[in-house]
Amino acid sequence: MVSSRRGFNPIAFTPWPVTILSSLVYLALIIPIIVVHHLVPPAPKESPAGVDLEEAWHDLQHLTRQYHPYNSHSNDEVHQWLLKRIHAISATSARSESQSGPEVFVFDDNQTNLTFSSAGVAATAITGVYFESRNIVVYIRGTEDEPGEWWKSPDGEPSGKGGVLVNAHYDSVSTGYGATDNGVGVITTLQLLKYFTTPGHYPRKGLVLLFNNGEEDFLNGAYAYSQHPMSKFTHTFLNLEGAGAGGRAVLFRSTDTEVTRFYGKSEHPFGTVLARDAFKLKFIRSETDYHVFDGVFGMRGLDVAFMEPRSRYHTDQDDARHTSIDSVWHMLSAAITTTEGLVSYTGDAFDGDSGDGGKLNNGIGTLGVWFDFFGSSFAVFQLNTLFGHSVALLVVAPLLLIITSVALFAVDKMYMFSMYTYISESGGQVSLYGLRGMFRFPLILGISTALTIALAFLIMKVNPFIIYSSPYAVWSMMLSTCMFFAWFISCVADFARPSALHRAYAFSWMFGIMWVFLVIATVYQKQHGIASSYFIVFYFAGVAVATWISYLELFGLPKTQDYARRQGRLSDRTPSSDSHFLAPSADELPSSSSAAGRDFNPEDVEDEEPTESTSLLRGQQRTTFANYASARGSQESNISNQGNNSLHPKDHRLEQKWSIYLMSSAWILQFLLVAPIVIILLGQLGLFLTSATYQIGADGGSQLVIYIGIAVLSVLILLPLFPFIHRFTYHIPTFLLFILIGTLVYNLTAFPFSHSNRLKLAFVQEMDLATGNNQASLVGVEPYIHDAVHAIPSVQDGKISCTSHGYGGRTKCSWPGLKPKVAEGPYKDWVSYNISQTKDDKITRFEVSGKNTRACKLLFDSPIADFHVQGSVVDKRIPHTGPKGVSEIRLWSRNWENTWTVDVEWTKKNSERTGKVMCLWSDDNDLHVIPELDLARKFAPWWVAITKLRDGLVEGSYSFEL
């Protein structure tokens, strides 16, 4: 007898196709996502026209030779070097004989000053600031700009289309060389000057390049720009910044959709709207000059910055050695594309009433949504578009399922949610087992999620800082935990109660869960302008279609009445005693041709409905769960000869008898509808969030949130596998079990820091100039702060005092330090001050100066009502006082050893007028100037990096009482 063998179906819903295909899809997407996230696109071997990458690299090396904070002599050297480079580039830019280049105007701003404050904090006293500008402003006149030098007139106003601003601050922190914060931004801006003064690249609209000084200490340079005439001319901006040390330059923030589209045309765009929402919701509290340009001036623009690793940020590893020419090119190429688009745009999108009184008339933008695909393409659309699609999906998707369900009931094919059906002729009851597996998915999801999140609490309890150097070990642990236990529970459930409706019920549960998530996301889109929930929209759309397909599959089943009649005829037969124990062989199953010639169905060879006399053993006897895979495999081989290709090959004969009619290949369509877009969007989001947060523990941030976030993201990334995971073979889950064990042991026992991921400890030395007593301090996290402090030779046991109050999750440990040598002469002469009062005692005048410094402070134990610095400008757009008063006044001068005259108005509640007069020193380029800092750098453990705590490395002060 010749058997009719069915051809092999490589996408059948059987263990090997499901295991292999789904694994390949995950690997094919996750690996490129990781590679793109960490590898920077290579710079071209030959510099493109208008730029010189070799020159840019040499400029970066020169710029980062020394620490150059605002309050240092090296900062003056950088200022002079920048002026020299700007004039050299302007003078040597190529010009054709037939066309002259654009006019270039260089403003060395040595006149602007401003008094302002940390406005916006109504519940507490604020910090007032007086700052004198050391900015350099370069204006490249656009080919369509109006001629003339309008800025020379006191009342001069620009005309025509607004210009474009590119900003980069050239000061560094006192403990970092500033290669990426913000050397690459400065070098990029210099190359933009070269590019837009090269023939063929002249800007149509005016371009202003701002090299601002003083960003690190309070965004001072950007605030001072508000008083420069060019601030009235620029309507859009591109801010270049660095909050890491190398890698790709990320689009941190953007004010609106319109400006973002120009960035989206970059060759290698990188970023997601999630970063903007994190700033908006105050999850990220540090700020860049973007805050001033957007919030104070009302300009429209973008914030492009480096973001990782944070362990090198503001340390001596922020140098040229730890970045690359590839990183320079990544920022430069994005800046060229974005700026070229902005200066070439002559439409009206950035002109007109902004609806915000007192700010620029640069039109009204629309909130946007954006994200990149593999660092090579960029999606940009309006938030209103996302909201519209969200609402449509919330309404249409449930209606579609309801209509489909009604249609299934109408044609008598709704097997889901059905326990029994009745034979209309005899009234007999036939079991459909349609509820089998209905509550399996929430059990699988709940247990696997709970176990994954439990690991987050375990790591926090035992080794909370392991993510600082080993984020991928944490990711591997979370993913393998979720995957293994989801598979294990699925297999146990499938072994005990096999169900052909597992897929349909799983997708139905996913539909309900994601629908709730989408409701929440839609509310936040509308009420709070939060766009980072875009992945939920795509997630729900894929799940909705996949769920609908599961419902459509039911139309291929026989009517429940027809099925009941067949079962009724089958029940009239008297089975042999062995029929309960032995499954039919392949030869006993009818071929499709023989089935057509007689009244026989494949269901006829299935197990009978259970009764009181039914054997406890199933037709296909399985002795142990260990034989799960081999039993499944034997079932699959036993039925390989039956049926035609259009029917389900009855892969698992213990499922419901009617399941033979279900499509065997529908699963692959469902999987491809959900998994790829989820892997891409959530994979990129997960890595972005990890890069932004995995080292915030050194700053006192909560790491539990990070671990729980990774756990939840792991579940969401693997969730598309849950409807199919019971079909997986044991091979990959077993391998993941070993990964789980290995990474768990590592994460619980490994030392959390490394040479490339050092723990940052913040240094400050406070000196009482009246007594000469000083306290050197390191601020960091427990328990590592104690190991670092005790490693310093000058620290004596018994003289260390530690406190955690007021340091945001960190501990400050102080000890008597070696006296600094930041100024000449006796330390009592380092700060000079004079205090005088008016006759009515309402105003007190402070005259303050410091040796070898241009930064001082006035600190008040009780907030004052107001203050005025002689010679200062006040801008009504930028308040310098608040409703709760001012507790601190920071004074910055462009000149060394300047004398500030400050008039202070006391509040009526100021019965005790006490405080401190303080000056700061931040220049640590010479050894032995701050010997205690030298010792900390030299003798602290290898896994420690020293950074600054406040504006000054050394603070010398006198107390006063009036």
Curated annotation (Swiss-Prot):
Cofactor note: Binds 2 Zn(2+) ions per subunit.
Cofactor: Zn(2+)
Compositionally biased tracts (Acidic residues): 602-611
Localization (cell): Vacuole membrane
GO molecular function ontology, one term from the record: metalloexopeptidase activity
Pfam families given in the database record: Peptidase_M28, PFF1_C, PFF1_TM
Span list, region Disordered: 568-617
InterPro entries hit by this protein: Fxna-like_M28_dom, M28_fam, Peptidase_M28, PFF1_C, PFF1_TM
Residues exposed to the Vacuolar side: 37-390, 462-472, 525-534, 689-704, 753-962
Glycosylation sites: N110, N113, N834
Domain of life: Eukaryota
Phosphoprotein in keyword set: no
TM segment ranges: 16-36, 391-411, 441-461, 473-493, 504-524, 535-555, 668-688, 705-725, 732-752
Binding site for Zn(2+) 2: D181, E216, H314
Gene3D superfamilies attached to this UniProt entry: Zn peptidases
Cytoplasmic compartment segments: 1-15, 412-440, 494-503, 556-667, 726-731
Record-marked site positions (Transition state stabilizer): Y313
Assigned keywords, A-Z: Glycoprotein, Hydrolase, Membrane, Metal-binding, Metalloprotease, Protease, Transmembrane, Transmembrane helix, Vacuole, Zinc
GO cellular component: vacuolar membrane
Active site as annotated: E215
GO-annotated biological processes: proteolysis
Membrane association type: Multi-pass membrane protein
Protein role: May be involved in vacuolar sorting and osmoregulation.
Annotated family: Belongs to the peptidase M28 family.
Protein's name in the database: Vacuolar membrane protease
Organism name: Trichophyton verrucosum (strain HKI 0517)
